[in-house]
Amino acid sequence: MIREAQRSELPAILELWLESTTWGHPFIKANYWRDCIPLVRDAYLANAQNWVWEEDGKLLGFVSIMEGRFLAAMFVAPKAVRRGIGKALMQYVQQRHPHLMLEVYQKNQPAINFYQAQGFHIVDCAWQDETQLPTWIMSWPVVQTL
């Protein structure tokens, strides 16, 4: 079931984020993600609209939107991957936001494939100084240029 996250759930969401991001980014050292906890907690989760997927009292996924259009986070617990939770969360936010942008590591092909299956298109590239890795900027729906 998808519902809006409560502020009191931010620690549980942060725990789910750390588990999922470490699992989903094996090309980045786990200590990098642990070092990011204060930033994710204080700058992202605290300032985003957050929705969670809850099942039997457990949080199995979440999505965070910042500034009404930036998909800042989208994670599903590793044990719950490929059950349709990510797709349901994405459709939920797509129904509420007419335009979404996100940034994804170019090495994260499973995530890129997922986003493309949800209608996102690569529109630009960027560089992450902290990880020294390239990223794709993706947009939904596709941005038309003249």
Swiss-Prot record:
Checking Pfam families in the record gives: Acetyltransf_1
Query: What enzyme category does the UniProt record give?
Result: transferase
Give the source's domain of life in one word: Bacteria
Please tell me, according to the UniProt entry, what happens when changing residue 70 to A: Decreases activity
Q: What happens when the gene is disrupted?
A: Mutant shows the same motility as wild-type strain.
Q: Which residues form the N-acetyltransferase domain?
A: 1-143
InterPro entries in alphabetical order: Acyl_CoA_acyltransferase, GNAT_dom
EC number(s) reported in the record: 2.3.1.-
Keyword flag Acyltransferase: yes
The protein's GO terms of the molecular function aspect are: protein-lysine-acetyltransferase activity
The record's family statement is:
Belongs to the acetyltransferase family.
Stored NCBIfam families: PRK10562.1 (NF007853)
Q: Output this protein's name.
A: Peptidyl-lysine N-acetyltransferase YiaC
